[in-house]
Every structure is written in structure tokens, then in C-alpha cells.
């Protein structure tokens, strides 16, 4: 995936999420599928926190530090600790959107040389900023697919 393709994909996510959750009832937002998967609301809260504390921090560190060690984030642990199921949708969605736009502003200024800058991502290993960008877009796609399955079950 090229830088341009990844950025285009990342740009679409806030609007994709807004469209996916538009008109959902409280029961639909909180529907908990079997297997320990996130509800729709928990997905949005997760995306918000990973955008801010995961990919946003990783982006800043790769650009500011020489070969940083980037920690993994335990999304399930965050969901429990932060009580995602008790949060409100709109503030979470708005915070995700603001963070995504801020990160995109930085990404759009990244040079080809900076895309080759390396880091060590816990659980993955050695990556470049370009690879991090791909992982970011893949993370979005995974949640879009998860939300599509959830929405099919609740509508």
C-alpha cells in the first residue's frame, strides 16, 4: 500500500464511522457479541484511544526520536479500565475525529525519507514509518469489518 493510499484510507474513517453508527439505538450500540468482542460503542472508544495513545504517539515518536521502542497497547485492558460500555458515543466519535485530523495533518507532511525511519514495535518487531502507516490503515479496516458484522446482527 502506498503512502497516498494509506492516507486516503485513514481520511475516510471518521465519515465511515459516522455513517455506520447513524441512527443506532442505545441497545444496538451496547449489543455485546459472543466471544468477548467489542460492542459498537466499545469499538468507537477503542478507536479513539488507539488513535490518540497508540498510532498518534507512535507517529510523533518515530518522527522525533532515533529508532524508538514503541509499546503495544492492550485494547481489552483499556476497555475494562476505562469502562467503555458506560461512555457516550458522540464525545468518543468527536475525539476520534479530532485526533485523526491532527494525525493526518502530520502525515501529509511526511517525506519519503521519513517513511524509511525505523522503530521497534512491541509484538511486531522492526518497522518503518511507512509500515506503521500500513498497519494503521489495516487496523481501521479490521474495525470496519467488525462493525459491519455487528451492525448486521443488530439491525
Located regions from the model:
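Short coil/turn linker and secondary-structure boundary residues
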Residues: 1, 24, 38, 84-87, ...
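Alpha-helical bundle segments that constitute or directly flank the non-heme di-iron/ferroxidase center
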Residues: 1-28, 50-61, 135-138
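Small-residue-biased structural context
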Residues: 1-3, 7-10, 14, 82-89, ...
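Acidic/histidine-rich alpha-helical segments that form the ligand environment
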Residues: 9-14, 20, 77-116
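Amphipathic, soluble alpha-helical interaction motifs
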Residues: 16, 20-23, 27, 58, ...
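Alpha-helix C-capping/helix-to-loop hinge sites
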Residues: 27, 46-47, 81, 87
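Short, contiguous alpha-helical
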Residues: 30-75, 104, 118-155
